[in-house]
Amino acid sequence: MKKKVLLLLGPNLNLVGIREKSVYGEVNAETIEDNVKKYGESIGIEVTVFQSNWEGALIDEIHKAHTVYDAVIINPGALTHYSYALHDAIKGVSIPFIEVHMSNIHQREEFRHKSVTAPACVGQIAGFGAKGYELALSYIAETEL
């Protein structure tokens, strides 16, 4: 049976390819999302993408996720650093989450070094650009969840 994975993207990730190209690169968000879906298909995973700039909308998707998906790949954006509500929502559902960041958050501004959401996740991938989403999918494909 094909695994189903939600790619959950937080605030400002719709602007990838437009903002801070030196950090996030020049490939736009839509292309990255399409590439992640194609990669998922190639390894037997159906990927659905949801992006929102609103914390509550992300929490609502997390609440729904456990009845639909086998796992969630989450890039909470800046919410990573302070959203205990996202942390609690992740802990509140019984499916694995993998936190992914395109940039290496530990090489950036000091306030970005701490993730309050990562402790609620199976693991964190950071610093490999959009390839990080594929790395997370590979882990999900190779692991009994």
Question: Language-model segments: which ranges?
Answer:
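Glycine- and acidic-residue-enriched helix-capping/strand-helix junction motifs
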Residues: 16-30
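Short glycine-rich anion-binding loops that position phosphate/pyrophosphate groups of nucleotides
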Residues: 11-13, 77-80, 103-105
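Short acidic active-site motifs
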Residues: 57-61
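Short, glycine-/small-residue-rich phosphate/pyrophosphate-handling segment
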Residues: 107-145
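Extreme N-terminal starter segment of soluble prokaryotic enzymes
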Residues: 2-5
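Short, acidic/small-residue loops that bind anionic groups at enzyme active sites
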Residues: 91-108
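Short acidic/histidine-rich motifs immediately flanking catalytic phosphotransfer sites
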Residues: 65-72
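Short beta->alpha junction loops
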Residues: 48-56
